[in-house]
Curated annotation (Swiss-Prot):
This is GDSL esterase/lipase At5g03980. It comes from Arabidopsis thaliana. It is found in: Secreted. The active site is at S36 (nucleophile), D294, H297. It holds the Pfam family Lipase_GDSL. Its EC number is 3.1.1.-. One of its GO terms (molecular function) is hydrolase activity, acting on ester bonds. Residues 1-21 form the signal peptide. Glycans are attached at N77.
Length: 323
């Protein structure tokens, strides 16, 4: 776990918006669970050369950012994948472990009731779950088998949200999945010959439909959570439509909308055998034109535009507690 001034850019921009609205709705801390979308160094810190259970870094007196997200992590425990003959890396830090870190952090820093400590906090439970499906897709599992994972993944995410609520959280954002059929890594790895299998933006329809299936089931689970905890603001983070908003924006170069900024080769400037950071792979010189940074993650500009879409949605639903 790392405590840092900047989580993902997406979360950081959201925090700035909350600070600016602090007169109406004071938020003094953000707790982030997730994967590489939010990881700012936990994978390295939690690697073979480090302690397997990192200790919390000291908090600042105000405006606390605590990030439990680890690159490559899953919503489900590793045993789920081993039972299905899927390999996941030893560094996998599933939601259950991230929650254990959170509980340890809370015990070491909260000297009153956890409800009092968390009443001015915002919890981001995700984005997570994409890797649960990735391990199936990229290890050759059929679509219908991977689709059967969705209820399990959604169950793990909602169980995590339930745990932080029981700990005292009153503002919880649960993001959905991206339209992964628009990402260079998927467009390159799973090409199809029939142009009817691509939408008007050039994205793979069947993969976007899969993401929507996950998102629909997640929203149904969130609706149930709201009935279970009527006094808690549980907000669905619509990353799918936030990305589509970016894709439609005139502020990006349409000719490279589906291409990786840092990469090489192929129609989407992405080669899984020579990813960003590999020897000979050029660094992008004009990231302001691109949506995708490395074929998997987005550019800072894209995240900034996503945040514009998300901020009003989230800010209008969070629970304000001044006492």
């Amino acid at each position: 776990m790392s405590t840092t001034k900047a989580l993902s850019l997406l979360v950081f921009i959201l925090f700035v918006s909350l600070v600016h609205s602090s007169d109406q709705c004071p938020i003094n801390s953000i707790y982030q669970f997730g994967d590489s979308i939010s990881d700012t160094g936990n994978l390295i810190r939690n690697g073979p050369a480090s302690s397997p259970t990192p200790k919390p870094l000291p908090q600042r007196e105000h405006n606390v950012f605590v990030n439990f997200g680890v690159s490559g992590s899953t919503a489900l425990n590793s045993s789920f994948f081993s039972e299905r003959n899927l390999h996941v890396p030893a560094t996998n830090t599933p939601l259950s472990m991230q929650l254990a870190w959170f509980k340890g952090h809370l015990r070491s820093t909260c000297h009153g009731s956890s409800s009092d400590c968390l009443k001015h906090s915002l919890f981001m439970v995700g984005e997570i779950g994409g890797n649960d499906y990735n391990y199936g897709f990229f290890q050759g599992k059929p679509m219908e088998e991977i689709r059967s994972y969705i209820p399990h993944v959604v169950g793990a995410i909602t169980a995590a949200a339930r745990e932080v609520i029981r700990a005292g959280a009153v503002n919880v954002v649960v993001p959905g999945n991206f339209p992964v059929g628009c990402f260079p890594i998927y467009l390159t790895s799973f090409p199809v010959k029939d142009t009817k299998d691509y939408d008007d933006n050039g994205c793979l329809t069947h993969l976007n439909e899969f993401a929507m299936d996950h998102n629909n089931q997640l929203q149904e689970a969130i609706a149930s959570l709201r009935k279970e905890f009527p006094d808690v603001a549980i907000v669905y983070g619509d990353y799918y439509n936030a990305f589509q908003y970016v894709l439609r924006s005139e502020r990006f170069d349409k000719s490279v909308a589906l291409k990786s900024c840092c990469g090489t080769g192929g129609a989407y400037n992405y080669d899984g055998k020579r990813p960003y950071g590999a020897v000979g792979v050029p660094v992008c010189q004009n990231p302001h034109k691109f949506i995708s940074w490395d074929g998997v993650h987005l550019t800072q500009k894209a995240y900034r535009f996503m945040s514009k879409f998300l901020n009003n949605q989230i800010l209008s639903q969070i629970k304000c507690t001044r006492a």
